[in-house]
Amino acid sequence: MEELIRKANVLMEALPYIQRFNNKTIVIKYGGHAMVDGRLKHEFARDVVLLKYIGLNPVIVHGGGPQIGQVLKSMGKESRFVQGMRVTDQETMDVAEMVLGGKVNKEIVANINRHDGKAVGLSGKDGRLILARKLEMTAINPDTLTPEIVDVGLVGDVESINTEVITALENNGFIPVIAPIGAGLAGETYNINADIVAGRIAGALRAEKLILLTDVEGVKDKQGKLISTIDTQRVPDLINNGTITGGMIPKLNCCIDALDEGVHTAHIIDGRVEHACLLEIFTDRGVGTAVGRFTS
């Protein structure tokens, strides 16, 4: 009986959040360990279906870097990175589009549909969803110690998002699953960082939440303790004093950009935790790090 009461209390704790987020859009960047662990893939798909059934509108944007790397390796092609961006020639772009828009995207769609969801797979080329431009990058030349433009090939940045196809799918009960591939004005194809795509889509949709699934608990302080909430005003100081470093910097910048475009809150959470998205959305404590404007 105590176990049954505990389960009932969990449902009651979720009720105000279900009411608050009814018909709201939640953009989830799906990547990392949650995409490769069989049990976590299964649970993520079930969680997404649950979100839709109880009245939320989940939009999934997925990565797939390791899967691209595996295919390139099998072809005998070495992967090169500059500041975390894969150098993408035409052959690599063809592989990325095949892996992201084909294998990875359709596997996620199939997993969701297996649990009675109605997922539809898209890339940024579909419905002119993602208009992209070539990413301009600079790096410090080690000889001259001056910044220089670095050509990383067909790596893109988001120029604009066309939300029509997403809202049409949402309004008809479908769950969009989006591969981070964009199209340029001249029809060229670009590989885009999935965090950036998720943030820009969340902003364009004025989503209630942007959730980035990662392979860490969230943002940590210098003692390794999780920081549960970060006001955007604190981020520059946390970067300057070395608290936030490495790959967490672009993730936080992505969150801030999404907030600037109208997203209510952004969250960096541990995708290795079972039901991480549900715990973040429907519990008082949440999980991971919430990023927002919490001070006036």
Swiss-Prot record:
Family membership noted in the UniProt record: Belongs to the acetylglutamate kinase family. ArgB subfamily.
GO annotation (BP), single: L-arginine biosynthetic process
Q: Which organism is it from?
A: Syntrophotalea carbinolica (strain DSM 2380 / NBRC 103641 / GraBd1)
Write out the GO cellular component annotations. Answer: cytoplasm
- List keywords of the entry alphabetically: Amino-acid biosynthesis, Arginine biosynthesis, ATP-binding, Cytoplasm, Kinase, Nucleotide-binding, Transferase
Q: Quick one: where is this thing mainly located?
A: cytoplasm
The EC designation for this entry is: 2.7.2.8
Which residues are substrate-binding? G64, G65, R86, N191
The protein's name: Acetylglutamate kinase
The pathway to which it is assigned is: Amino-acid biosynthesis; L-arginine biosynthesis; N(2)-acetyl-L-ornithine from L-glutamate: step 2/4
Reactions catalysed according to its record: N-acetyl-L-glutamate + ATP = N-acetyl-L-glutamyl 5-phosphate + ADP
